[in-house]
Amino acid sequence: SNNIAQTAYKPEGKSPSQLVDEAEQKIFEIAERGSRNSTYLELRQMIQPTYDRLYQRSQKGGGLSGVSTGFRELDRLTAGLQKGELIIIAGRPSMGKTAFALNIAEHIALSDKNNPVAIFSMEMSAEQLTFRMISSLGMVHGSALKTGKLTDKDWDRVDGAIQQMKEAPIFIDDTPSLTPVELRARARRIQRERGLSLIVIDYLQLMQVPGSKENRATEISEITRNLKALARELQIPIIALAQLNRSVEQRTDKTPIMSDLRESGSIEQDADLIGFIYRDEIYHKDTDKKGQALIAIAKQRNGPIGDF
């Protein structure tokens, strides 16, 4: 506490937001040190709860052990989104990353009102996301919503979507350039007040590390490490969308590979699951796969890889 007070009296050219961020970070570190005392467990202590978890899974008939995404093939590969896991969904612009993540968020929140979802959107405003959800749930073309040229049938669908959305426990924070400390504080508050079953971050590279003099790769490493720690702390899955670098554009085969991730080293290391999204029609207008997206699971720490 003395250090925090001294920093406030002697800011050394730092902005108020940087001072608050550093104070929150120091408070978090103090809390972490306290929570880390005597945290070891004997293996024998873990046997019964682990056996109980296995028995619960067997009672489901080999079904999902995590939260259903609403995508049958993704659930088959992952057994659902698992608690404490950091999931990266990556792709080039216009591939449908946000739409894919929103579909998962909508499915989880609408399937059970006790499954609140938090969306931290640093790319789009809350209004833009709301329009996206109306389009998705109401099956109304985005261009019709943008121009306002709606048929009577469109209006019926919009009304139906809005009725569903009123019941959905989805919370949107559209603050740009969040820091890991800010995001963690906001996520904890929602968890404490409403509970959380999933966090979606759109997108990873738009997060910032204030006052950092490190290169961007090192900053991304700090961000992914913090997100993984938050997933474990809150015991929920976190989906972080990520942008792929331009090297994809120089290749004949545009299908994403792991090295296409910007500042990919730490992302690959910290993520429990990495999925790439690819739409062939973006590069080949005459493709027979119009309106289709390929989802490729390139890494899964505790399961198989594959695509659908």
Feature annotation, model-predicted:
Residues 71-80:
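Pre-Walker A adenine-sensing motif
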Residues 132-141, 204-228, 250-254:
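Conserved P-loop NTPase nucleotide-binding/switch module
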Residues 218-308:
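Phosphate-binding/switch region of NTP-binding enzymes
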Residues 76, 107-195, 209, 308:
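Cytosolic-facing regulatory segments adjacent to core modules
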